[in-house]
Design a protein with these regions (language model features):
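Pre-recognition alpha-helix immediately N-terminal to the DNA-recognition helix
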Residues: 46-50
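Short, cationic-aromatic polyanion-contact patches
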Residues: 34-44, 59, 92-111
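A short, conserved structural fragment
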Residues: 83-92
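Short, Lys/Arg-enriched N-terminal segment that forms or immediately precedes the first helix
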Residues: 22-38
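A short acidic, leucine-rich amphipathic alpha-helix
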Residues: 62-68, 81
Length: 111
């Protein structure tokens, strides 16, 4: 899973990197560009991702309570992570439950 080649000329590098990761036991890996990775690697967002890796909260509110942050702040972080395809929502009819969209998230090679 990568970004559009017309927008990002490093798409081939990310695609090849994802293929190598798959061959070495890391299927379903999202490979982010360096620029996009900067949007993910904030302490609070990493805390949210760590929690989602271990738990399946029933709602954004439940996640916010679990990580000890304001629901609005967590909701905005989740929206940003969803735009990057890092997080998705499962709608169970009562609430949107945030989940990791991929088993792994990596960053393209820096050099």
């Amino acid at each position: 899973h990568t970004e559009d080649a017309d927008v990002d000329p490093r798409l081939a590098v990310r695609t090849a990197f994802a293929e190598v990761l798959t061959q070495h036991g890391f299927p379903d890996t999202l490979v982010l560009s360096r620029e996009r990775a900067g949007e993910v690697f904030h302490e609070r967002r990493l805390e949210i991702l760590d929690h989602l890796a271990e738990h399946d909260p029933e709602s954004v509110r439940a996640l916010a309570k679990a990580v000890g942050h304001d629901k609005g702040v967590v909701s905005r972080d989740l929206q940003a992570l969803a735009r990057l395809d890092v997080v998705e929502y499962v709608d169970d009819g009562r609430a949107k439950a945030p989940r990791l969209a991929h088993d792994h998230v990596a960053v393209e090679p820096v050099v």
